[in-house]
Amino acid sequence: MAFYSAVEAVLGVTWLSALFTLGSLSVFWLLRHRERKSQHALHNAWAQISAFDPSSLDRSKTADDWKTTRLGKATLVSNRYAHEIRNDERLSFQLGLEQDFLTTVPGLESLFGGTFHNGIVWDAAMHFSRKLNTVVDPLSEETIEYLQKNWGDDKEWHTVPLHHSMLMLIAQLTARLFIGEELCRDPEWLGIATGYTMDRTFAVKELQQWNPRLIPVVHWFLPSCRKLRATIKKARGFVDRVRTERKQKKTTADDTNRVDAMTWIDSVARDQNCSYDATLTQLRLAYAAVHTTGDMMTKVVAALCENPEMIEPLRKEIISIISEHGWREAALHKMTLLDSVLKESQRIQPLGLYTLSRIALEPITLDDGTQIKKGEQVKISTDHMWNSSIWPDAAQFDGYRFQRFRDNPDQSSAVSFVSLSANHMGFGYGKHACPGRFLAAIEAKVALCHLLLKYDFELENKEASAAQTEGVMIWRDHRAQLRIKRRVEKIEW
């Protein structure tokens, strides 16, 4: 960070940044034109593979006979190749991320801050996956605190913003597990954890409008990139303070009362005699977890509002299982209807329109003769998630769909929310699938148990909250309002 500050000082970034801001205004029309062109290319790609309006989310009529189509500079590949491509070492996962997220630019490097960071974040996710029973109580505690403070006990209908509520709830839950009790309720830290992701996304989008050869210079002056570096500096103050306080208290990873990634990662780093950037690691964890899980929660709550007949059966399942098995991870696994609802919501509205982004390291010929050129970026389409030849009545939300599949021996191995298959790639597919999906599932289930038992809720305006596409992403309208009121609980937590 001192190096970056020195560079900015030597280059006189303050006035140059102002100049770039003015210049940005003069070329605004060009950037908007490129964005519209990119959107048009995306819609053309979907039009080539589908017999429906690309702006619609009803993809039940997706064609089955397409193989590849262009998506900007990348090649969109049919799901038929998912199993073949998923673990092919000739297709680089790392380079795909670098191209999509510009991970080598200062201020953007939190996604990959060196090989140790790559491994340690993966290890952290795997660590939590093996100790999920220890996170249920902390997650429940934070959910109770958040809902009490932000949703309240009012038994009359009142409104809260759907997406913002889910985002900040998940931000607090993940902060409890990633950085600990010291900061998980701190508004400034939660602002950093949520804001950095969106600011980073905007900076990448802005940088990608420039010639790649200019990016190593341009990023020093663009206000969006400077803002990210300032955010990292601010985050560093929070993280360094917590680490210093813990060292003074001689807190170790063996402290059974502490369950958070920072404590555990510090321990691993000491064991491996490695140094690492704790701040960038925390931002990377937040980048990977907060908005993705918040988006998932937004969509499943909206789906329940649109399918209210699912709410009472879910409440009965939750009450029955917790009453018999207690409030622990094993009980959450027995909630097969809740699990099915989560998986169905993700099938109907996954995070985006493609997954498995890769860069070819050499010319590749797939089994059917399809050619992939060296250096070409390929992405697997998610259109199969809405294909009626795979999913009966694919356009319809069926909360019982995956619960029914559990009784079918041919389908039972891939029905849980966290399971992976070529036909449902909500968490990716292959060895690079989301390592944090087990933790995300526990977070979502804990939060939903509290929401369902403590509150009645409904969308204020179903039309205004409809799902929509923005570029390659599938969103719920962030302006949607949720009407809520406190209800009488029928269980003791």
Swiss-Prot record:
User: Which parts of the chain span the membrane according to its record?
Assistant: 10-30
Sorted keywords for this record are: Heme, Iron, Membrane, Metal-binding, Monooxygenase, Oxidoreductase, Transmembrane, Transmembrane helix
Obligatory cofactor(s): heme
What CDD domains does the record point to? CYP503A1-like
One Pfam match: p450
Q: Where does heme bind?
A: C434
Q: How can this protein be applied? A: Shearone derivatives produced by this cluster are interesting candidates for Alzheimer's disease (AD) therapy since they moderately inhibit aggregation of amyloid beta 42 (Abeta42).
A GO term from the CC aspect: membrane
A single MF term (Gene Ontology): monooxygenase activity
- What name has this protein been given in UniProt? Cytochrome P450 monooxygenase esdpG
By sequence similarity, the record places it as follows: Belongs to the cytochrome P450 family.
Pathway, per UniProt?
Secondary metabolite biosynthesis; terpenoid biosynthesis
Membrane topology, from the record: Single-pass membrane protein
Which processes are annotated in GO (biological process)? Answer: mycotoxin biosynthetic process
Which gene name does the record give? esdpG
Query: What SUPFAM superfamilies has UniProt attached to this entry?
Result: Cytochrome P450
Record organism: Penicillium shearii
**Any idea of its EC number?**
1.-.-.-
